[in-house]
């Protein structure tokens, strides 16, 4: 039965999540929900590597172009919207497929955080950063003080436990009603970084600079302007650095972001990664998905 099953495709930037998501949607009668914090913004197409119109014609996409530049889109917004969409997609008899690299979005949806708006979200993020900086010994010491019989000393579960002790949860959203299959994509670091560099060059040839300049002129302080691929050009527009330096900043920040994404998914979520250059890929993914759905 497919009635409560959701596919989730995660991984670092430039690894090939979009292509796999579309293939899965075509083969499994699915609809895609974007799990990317920047693709919600209208008009920011190149720098966010947003699905093209041609790609959108191949499969139904949701949470693309749903906010203006000047509007915020929080984790709370994503969880509420994604839950609504999952329910609607399943009611249509289709398979929901979450595709994205924003780890906090995906984790919050799967684990059912009750974020309660921006204030609670900010406090939770501060606590999470503090807990993540602790050594295993320090983290588990905190857990065992509260629960000496904690069943499994696992970093992800320990952090989750301490967050729930601090913020609690509500019946409204204390956990997900859905069964998720997480599909993680990865590639050898050297290869991934080269793909990232090449993609930035491609974005430049497609008009990224003009897109960034428009954002700089119209909404430089908006949440949308804080994304990688835009903010790096602002010092160039102000005459502080060269264009070459700005492009190198985009590449460097994108590589660092990819590393952070992988760290997040490995440490905080139970993801089995597939090497996109493996001889068995993507057949191995389709086999797992078929078994999961049936």
Curated annotation (Swiss-Prot):
Xref: Pfam families: IPPT
EC number: 2.5.1.75
Reactions catalysed: adenosine(37) in tRNA + dimethylallyl diphosphate = N(6)-dimethylallyladenosine(37) in tRNA + diphosphate
Named cofactor requirement(s): Mg(2+)
Record keyword Transferase present: yes
Domain of life (superkingdom): Bacteria
Catalytic class of the enzyme: transferase
Signal peptide: none
PANTHER family, alphabetized: TRNA DIMETHYLALLYLTRANSFERASE
Annotated family: Belongs to the IPP transferase family.
Name listed for the protein in its UniProt record: tRNA dimethylallyltransferase
Provenance organism: Lactococcus lactis subsp. cremoris (strain SK11)
Gene that specifies this protein: miaA
